[in-house]
A protein has these predicted regions:
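C-terminal and inter-domain tail/linker signature
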Residues: 2-281
Length: 281
């Protein structure tokens, strides 16, 4: 009886410890989300460059092909773009990464939509990647690049990350587009890409047509993922017609099935052609 009581006590203490760690992780994730959302808004909409000192690490690493190195590059960007504004639509937090899906105006003649990924360390932003493309009209199914489901929901982020990584490896890196049937319900798929309509048939036909024209979307590797609830953002590298591209693709999973996606797929320079020495990925 004593041994049984000791075992139960040990299990109880272990469960409490795990719950404490989980709560601590949740708190850190929410702190990172709040930091990035506040700093991003203050800098790119409010043009408050003081956040470069309060919210960024002095050793900040910039990977964006649009910005020169470090904090000086961000300061110059804000100075050069007095009409710049940003509308955040989705903000995902996962460990030390926070991803923002939204729309920039004032950076170019046409609004730009896409993704920013930030890495946070010790309460400061330490690293940043982005992928932005020109805003396009709604696709043939009436969806824009930003509308649709907003919140991540209550899904199992780690299970969904594994699911999407497996789908991505088989279907996009491996080029077996029938994966869109295996990982969805086989028919339904909500599409926010400007060039493709809804449905599994539409996305497979689009990818097959590109391949037949010699313009296959080539995927080489996933560099990072940001998963929260039913959302998984993949940041990957590849090429189209021999030109290097970054693939930012946001997937939504419901009950173990792929149901919706958004993307931004900009052409990017080779690392030695970038405005900095940190590489694009």
């Amino acid at each position: 009886m004593v041994k049984q009581r000791d075992t139960l006590t040990s299990l109880s203490q272990g469960s409490a410890h795990e719950a404490g760690r989980s709560n601590e992780t949740d708190q850190q994730r929410e702190a990172n989300r709040a930091l990035v959302a506040q700093v991003h808004e203050a800098l790119f909409t409010g043009h408050d460059v003081s956040v470069l000192d309060s919210g960024f690490s002095p050793d900040f690493i910039e990977h964006s092909p649009l910005v020169k190195d470090g904090l000086a590059g961000l300061r110059q960007l804000v100075s050069d773009c007095p009409d710049m504004r940003h509308e955040a639509v989705r903000v995902l937090a996962d460990g030390d990464l926070v991803a923002i899906h939204g729309r920039f105006t004032g950076l170019a003649e046409t609004p730009l939509v896409g993704f920013d990924i930030y890495r946070v360390a010790h309460g400061r932003i330490i690293e940043h990647w982005d992928g932005l493309v020109p805003e396009a009209p709604p696709n043939v199914s009436g969806h824009t690049q930003l509308d649709g489901t907003i919140g991540p929901g209550e899904g199992d982020a780690e299970a969904n990350r594994i699911f999407i990584t497996r789908f991505f490896t088989e279907t996009l890196i491996g080029g077996d587009y029938s994966g869109f049937r295996r990982y969805t319900d086989g028919t339904n798929f909500i599409q926010h890409s400007p060039d493709i309509g809804d449905g599994v048939d539409a996305v497979i036909a689009f990818l097959d047509d590109l391949a037949a024209q010699g313009n296959r979307l080539e995927y080489q590797r996933i560099h990072r993922t940001v998963a929260e609830g039913g959302f998984v953002l993949t940041h990957s590298e590849g090429s189209i017609s021999g030109r290097r591209h970054a693939y930012f693709e946001l997937w939504r999973v419901v009950d173990g099935r792929l149901v919706e996606m958004w993307d931004a797929i900009p052409e990017v320079p080779q690392d030695h052609e970038a405005l900095h020495d940190h590489g694009i990925f």
